[in-house]
Design a protein with these regions (language model features):
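Residue-level recognition of tetratricopeptide repeat
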Residues: 13, 47, 85, 118, ...
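TPR alpha-solenoid repeat register
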Residues: 41, 75, 79, 112-113, ...
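Short coil/turn linking the two alpha-helices of tandem helical-hairpin repeats
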Residues: 73, 124, 156-159, 193, ...
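Structural signature of tandem alpha-helical TPR/SEL1-like repeats
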Residues: 18-26, 52-61, 90-102, 122-135, ...
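TPR/TPR-like (Sel1-like) alpha-helical repeat modules
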Residues: 67, 170-176, 187-213
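Structural signature of alpha-solenoid helical repeat junctions
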Residues: 3, 37, 75, 108, ...
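Structural marker of alpha-solenoid helical repeat scaffolds
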Residues: 34, 68-72, 105-106, 139, ...
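Canonical tetratricopeptide repeat
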Residues: 10, 44-47, 78, 82, ...
Length: 236
């Protein structure tokens, strides 16, 4: 056990919890170099590495967690879920889904529904995505991510924008800062000619903390804002 590493790791976790991500990364990096070895601290580090796209380093941290003795079933599940996300990002979506669906047989919760629901969309099978995301909403019909997933399913896979919007509207009512929901709703605003509202939504989305589980990227949002600024002669 590394007293110093874990002490710094606790500071990193506290910063992480306050959404001070840049500070958290710096502290996690230092803590890891000093031997941080508490599962919950390493988990926090791995999550932040995944969210910031440092997948090889995240995989290294996950392997360190896996080697620790006495992991609880919940910690093992969390490990497998994060490993699956890395696999997906490295181009192995089907293998990632196998791992997630195996875990899902033993644990059904909002997090699992939201992750698998989104990856079902990424797989591109509209019927499978609709069926799973319908089940997710039967589990919790107020979950913002599951509502957004259903909206994306209709928008991206089915091509039914009218039905999609009903889910995006419900999702934004649950989480007004949601990156993807704001992005998609901005597209409706643009079609309706409400440029002001579209820009407001895009700026809200741009201010979020992105992860691999977001459809919209900072680059996509910046491009859309630039397009609106050029088209309507605005300074954005």
């Amino acid at each position: 056990m590394s007293f110093m590493g874990n002490m710094i790791g606790n500071k990193a976790l506290a910063a992480h919890g306050k959404n001070e991500y840049e500070k958290a990364v710096q502290l996690y990096d230092e803590a890891y170099e000093k031997g941080m070895d508490k599962p919950r601290l390493l988990r926090g580090y791995s999550v932040l590495l995944i969210r910031t796209g440092h997948f090889d380093k995240a995989l290294e941290v996950l392997k360190k967690i896996e080697a620790l003795p006495g992991l609880t079933p919940a910690e093992k599940t969390d490990l497998h879920v994060n490993y699956a996300i890395i696999l997906w990002q490295k181009g192995h979506l089907d293998r990632a889904m196998e791992i997630l669906e195996d875990e899902f047989r033993h644990l059904k919760n909002g997090t699992m529904y939201s992750i698998i629901g989104y990856l079902k969309i990424e797989q591109g099978d509209a019927d499978a995505a609709l069926a799973f995301n319908k089940e997710a909403l039967e589990y919790d019909d107020t979950d913002a991510v599951s509502l957004d997933n259903m909206g994306q399913t209709y928008y991206r896979l089915v091509g039914d924008k009218e039905t999609a919007k009903t889910y995006f509207d419900r999702a934004i009512a649950q989480k007004s800062t949601a990156i993807d929901t704001n992005y998609f709703l901005s597209l409706y605003d643009i079609e309706a000619g409400d440029t002001e509202k579209a820009i407001e939504r895009l700026k809200t989305a741009r201010g979020g903390f992105f992860s691999p589980l977001n459809y919209a990227t900072p680059e996509m949002i910046d491009a859309k804002l630039a397009e609106l600024g050029t088209k309507y002669g605005r300074y954005i």
